[in-house]
A protein has these predicted regions:
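A short Gly-Trp-Pro
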Residues: 2-13, 18-160
Length: 160
């Protein structure tokens, strides 16, 4: 049987260290969101989200509190965070079944998961200049146009 370290691809935690987690696999897709809601939630210009199956995430230290907030779809989302420092760890967007949206920069090795796209550039702060060569969208993307075949299959299974 494989040890926990052999089954762990990524580790993450909150700022105070009270919450820790692991991921078994790469996310389905990672993007930088520039919508005004994400700007407000993070008090920053954008957030980097990694979409993955809930089964990929294991909370191995602490507990998470939750708050419910609005989302661009209007369906809302549940934000899971450290109850002490308040760091957001992930969100569960209503209607995405067995998927969660990890706040990528909570990973210890977040540099290994750069965004594969930028979304909601119609609300990007004007002073932010993007110099990367990844796909950019004024709103959101169609998965079929940007996801790999493997990612599309994983999404299909998770949405069942």
């Amino acid at each position: 049987m494989a040890s926990e370290n052999e089954m762990t691809k990524y580790n993450g935690k909150c700022s105070c260290g009270r919450v820790g987690y692991t991921l078994k696999n790469d996310p389905i897709f990672t993007h930088a969101c520039h919508c005004t809601l994400c700007q407000r939630y993070t008090a920053s210009a954008f957030i980097v989200h990694s979409l993955m199956e809930t089964s990929n995430f294991t909370l191995n230290k602490g507990v998470l509190s939750e708050t419910v907030g609005p989302s661009g779809s209007g369906k809302g989302h549940v934000i899971k965070r450290c109850p002490k420092c308040g760091d957001q760890i992930y969100s569960h967007f209503m209607g995405l079944n067995n998927l969660l949206v990890l706040k990528t920069t909570t990973l210890s090795n977040a540099n290994e998961l750069p965004p594969q796209a930028h979304v909601f550039l119609d609300s990007k702060l004007e002073w932010l200049k993007l110099s990367d060569n990844i796909p950019k969208f004024d709103k959101f993307y169609r998965r079929e146009e940007i996801y790999s075949d493997e990612s599309l299959e994983r999404m299909k299974i998770a949405l069942q």
